[in-house]
Amino acid sequence: MTKQEAMAFAISVGKPIRHNSFSKGEFVRDEGKELVDEEGTILPQQEFWAIRSGGSWENGWEEYNDN
């Protein structure tokens, strides 16, 4: 899915998302105004998405599946 779709999915569905460039087991999930990664680290949403903009970051997002 696109970056915009991933952002909307994370907020509306509440399930973790990942980018195809993330390592196995890496994901973020929406927690209100912040994102939380797989280790519980709080990531400010605005900063997270600003860093991951343009180029390959605009596509390649998916729902995280730990299988």
Where are the regions a protein language model picked out?
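Structural boundary micro-motifs
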Residues: 1-67
